[in-house]
């Protein structure tokens, strides 16, 4: 793997983040699970940690930058070892792993409980968060695969 994988991972991560942002826009536009607002929960947690107000753009920017860089780079490094013969299949595996981390670690840290069950909304938040992660990771995988033909097949 040459040094070009970094830029390819960043481009794929950017595309995945853009797809995720579109899904979140549609969630808001169509009023899906209005009581499940993970970015507002993150904003509140950041405000609590810093002891001040946090602008609503901050959690969105952190998520977008994280998806475009850190997660994209992680995906680029583990891509050859992920199961599957396509970028989409590898993206699904990466997304399910990310969803498990979000459900078992991130949501509880935000005070939402395991898989956001503390919101008393049933399995809706868990399923939507799975859709969030799969939207990101499948696009990430497809774009990364297109930019790296023959790698990890």
Model-derived features: where do they sit?
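Juxtamembrane/disordered regions of integral membrane proteins
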Residues: 1-153
């Amino acid at each position: 793997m040459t040094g070009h994988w970094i830029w390819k991972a960043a481009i794929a991560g950017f595309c995945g983040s853009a797809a995720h942002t579109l899904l979140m826009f549609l969630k808001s536009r169509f009023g899906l699970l209005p009581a499940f607002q993970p970015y507002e929960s993150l904003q509140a947690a950041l405000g609590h940690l810093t002891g001040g107000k946090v602008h609503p753009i901050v959690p969105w920017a952190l998520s977008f930058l994280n998806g475009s860089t850190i997660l994209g780079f992680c995906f680029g490094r583990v891509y050859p070892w992920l199961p599957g013969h396509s970028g989409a299949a590898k993206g699904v595996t990466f997304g399910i792993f990310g969803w498990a981390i979000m459900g078992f670690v991130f949501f509880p840290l935000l005070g939402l409980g395991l898989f956001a069950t503390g919101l008393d909304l049933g399995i809706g938040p868990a399923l939507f968060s799975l859709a969030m992660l799969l939207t990101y990771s499948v696009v990430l995988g497809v774009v990364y695969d297109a930019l790296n033909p023959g790698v990890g097949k």
